Amino acid sequence: MMNLKYLLFFCLVQALHYCYAYGDPSLSNELDRFNPCPYSDDTVKMIILTRENKKHDFYTLNTIKNHNEFKKSTIKHQVVFITHGFTSTATAENFLAMAEALLDKGNYLVILIDWRVAACTNEMAGVKLAYYSYAASNTRLVGNYIATVTKMLVQQYNVPMANIRLVGHSLGAHTSGFAGKKVQELRLGKYSEIIGLDPAGPSFKSQECSQRICETDANYVQIIHTSNHLGTLVTLGTVDFYMNNGYNQPGCGLPIIGETCSHTRAVKYFTECIRHECCLIGVPQSKNPQPVSKCTRNQCVCVGLNAKTYPKTGSFYVPVESKAPYCNNKGKII
């Protein structure tokens, strides 16, 4: 039943991609008349985690100063925003696991953005998949919200933009991109990095840079591609990693039927890279990619938090295994 549901969703989002051009005024007018997933700043919540405080309490723009870190005059942590996608939440197991991996790795301040209302998560199970276009239309607004929080961090807590990184999955990747555009508009500078985990394809993949996540949205934009229907194979970033060629991830079953598994696998790959249980090595894309065993630091790039320390940019093929930690490099680290 679950696979049938996502097969129907696949058919739906393909229809939406061709019937509703993102940013089309006629679509905007229709969404204004009836929006089952309305955006409001009041419905966006934040979970704020540090090594010292891992409580999953929700905060808003009005209550954020009740958190201990925001009672200080300066925040010295590296900051990571994590943003979920369509019909998901900040409390989904995959995102909490990512946050935990970050805190195990370094002394981060992790802010999970929960925009479940505008992402249509609260709608009836049999109906909400039809509301994708409404959630897609809310991504820029959620991006503006993240930019507002960023402005607070920079201007009130002396956090350098170089200390702020955004991670977003699916629609959350485009939301992160819109945040990157907004902070530049506010003259705050650029984020250190934006990491797009299988950015949503429907409604976005044929759009110009201004209407989706783009390589100019941060100093470094890392894209991890894992599905070609719910996601996209279009190059979007400073580096684009095509895991198993960007679709049909090992262990996810048949094409299309396993599309949702492939789409969410991007989150799991990135989390494993944070844990450094292995280095998922990207080799430059070509008709005949070189073996991982012959990679050097100047030729290839490891997926993850350290990707931007490698000199090479562009598109990379990344071989993966079907089970965590997903390595296909026999322990090689470059």
Swiss-Prot record:
Catalyzes the hydrolysis of phosphatidylcholine with phospholipase A1 activity (6.3 U/ml). May act as an allergen and induce hemolytic activity. Belongs to the AB hydrolase superfamily. Lipase family. One of its GO terms (cellular component) is extracellular space. Expressed by the venom gland. It is an enzyme of class 3 (hydrolase). One of its GO terms (molecular function) is phospholipase A1 activity. Disulfide bonds join C37-C120, C209-C214, C252-C261, C278-C302, C279-C327, C295-C300. GO terms for biological process: killing of cells of another organism; lipid catabolic process. The lineage of its organism: Eukaryota, Metazoa, Ecdysozoa, Arthropoda, Hexapoda. SUPFAM superfamilies: alpha/beta-Hydrolases (SSF53474). It comes from Vespa affinis (Lesser banded hornet). PROSITE patterns: LIPASE_SER. It catalyses: a 1,2-diacyl-sn-glycero-3-phosphocholine + H2O = a 2-acyl-sn-glycero-3-phosphocholine + a fatty acid + H(+). Its EC number is 3.1.1.32. The active site is at S170, D198, H263. This is Phospholipase A1 2. It is found in: Secreted. Loses its activity after heat treatment.
